[in-house]
């Protein structure tokens, strides 16, 4: 365990005692170092190690502690003002820094300090919370919310109104993860630490949490908390055992590999689900 991690772990055990007035200099410096590291991509709350996603709980604890050490303060936002504990990521950015980091930010997009935005990303009017990681080439479309500590892969398209759940409210054990080369359809919600593996296509209006049945119609298998790589998923329902009613589920209607996904349009994939 690193010294930085040990400071965070110890502080978290006495978090109820920590306020902006009582926090000691060492703890405050450690928390601020973590937030700065998350902000620039040095740290990630979750990362893939040997093919499996691993959550670094101590980094998540540092994010939670950051709310304990700061008072609300006035935040300028061009035509308006805000009053919050967490600074905005781009508050001190210059044109040169935007050019250097290589992403686009459309007016009204909001990103909290402590979230990482990689190059070639486009942020339409959307919200990215503290601790989130948005990787290269991703489109974050209008009214998307990327929750605290959520992990978004490379070349992902988060369509209009998509919600990616966070870990802070309500408190979750693990962040929601969207793998590389995924398409998440408009108004869909992926929450509660669900993992959408690489190359998935999620249709419009699909809601997936840890208790959602994810039914593979080809195999009859039911998954929870994980959408297998290359899945094309739509909303559906499954009948109860006695046939008296049906309950919502997500249905894997087909699987596609990266080559097919690259050649075939998304609309074509979704319009041929009855084959």
Curated annotation (Swiss-Prot):
Residues at which substrate binds: 104, 141
Domain of life: Bacteria
Keyword field: Acyltransferase, Amino-acid biosynthesis, Cytoplasm, Diaminopimelate biosynthesis, Lysine biosynthesis, Repeat, Transferase
Enzyme Commission number(s): 2.3.1.117
Biological process annotations from GO: diaminopimelate biosynthetic process; lysine biosynthetic process via diaminopimelate
GO cellular component terms given for this protein: cytoplasm
SUPFAM superfamilies attached to this UniProt entry: Trimeric LpxA-like enzymes
Subcellular location: Cytoplasm
Keyword Transferase included in the entry's annotation: yes
Catalytic activity: (S)-2,3,4,5-tetrahydrodipicolinate + succinyl-CoA + H2O = (S)-2-succinylamino-6-oxoheptanedioate + CoA
Pathway: Amino-acid biosynthesis; L-lysine biosynthesis via DAP pathway; LL-2,6-diaminopimelate from (S)-tetrahydrodipicolinate (succinylase route): step 1/3
InterPro entries referenced in this protein's UniProt entry, alphabetically: DapD_Trfase_Hexpep_rpt_fam, Hexapep, Hexapep_transf_CS, THP_succinylTrfase_dom1, THP_succinylTrfase_N_sf, Trimer_LpxA-like_sf
CDD domains linked to this entry: LbH_THP_succinylT (cd03350)
GO-annotated molecular function: 2,3,4,5-tetrahydropyridine-2,6-dicarboxylate N-succinyltransferase activity; nucleotidyltransferase activity
Top EC group: transferase
Pfam families: Hexapep_2, THDPS_N_2
Xref: PANTHER family: 2,3,4,5-TETRAHYDROPYRIDINE-2,6-DICARBOXYLATE N-SUCCINYLTRANSFERASE, MOLYBDENUM COFACTOR GUANYLYLTRANSFERASE
Quaternary context: Homotrimer.
Classification via HAMAP family: DapD
Family (UniProt): Belongs to the transferase hexapeptide repeat family.
Name of the featured protein: 2,3,4,5-tetrahydropyridine-2,6-dicarboxylate N-succinyltransferase
Organism: Mannheimia succiniciproducens (strain KCTC 0769BP / MBEL55E)
